[in-house]
């Protein structure tokens, strides 16, 4: 076997459709575009969503949902599982977490969420707690201060 003897598998190469080359070619005359109308003409068709002059659906439907919140509450978020490396009876604040490298950016007041497990007792001072986080901190013997 040589490179000069190689050829593609039979049926793997499909011939390009040549339109407008006479009726006998199978795609002559109207070239597969039907008879008359906008879709048979040259050039691009209509834009997406165009309904022939009728008021399109995206303009008939009312604009109701997905308003942006004007004054969103942005929190610096930390999960309970991230606090397990801290020593017991430590006072946890946003400043202490930034000093420890657990939190890198100050996106607003601290909020503690309940993902993960906590085994050490900590005194956590934050702006907000989720219900699960509060339960896990108190179950480990710690306290929550808002």
Swiss-Prot record:
Residues 1-52 are annotated as: Disordered. It comes from the Bacteria. InterPro entries: Ribosomal_uL15, Ribosomal_uL15/eL18, Ribosomal_uL15/eL18_sf, Ribosomal_uL15_bac-type, Ribosomal_uL15_CS. GO terms for molecular function: rRNA binding; structural constituent of ribosome. One of its GO terms (biological process) is translation. Keywords: Ribonucleoprotein, Ribosomal protein, RNA-binding, rRNA-binding. One of its GO terms (cellular component) is cytosolic large ribosomal subunit. Pfam families: Ribosomal_L27A. The keyword rRNA-binding applies. Residues 11-20 have a biased composition (Basic residues). The keyword rRNA-binding applies. Residues 23-35 have a biased composition (Gly residues). HAMAP family: Ribosomal_uL15. Belongs to the universal ribosomal protein uL15 family. Part of the 50S ribosomal subunit. Binds to the 23S rRNA. This is Large ribosomal subunit protein uL15. The gene is rplO.
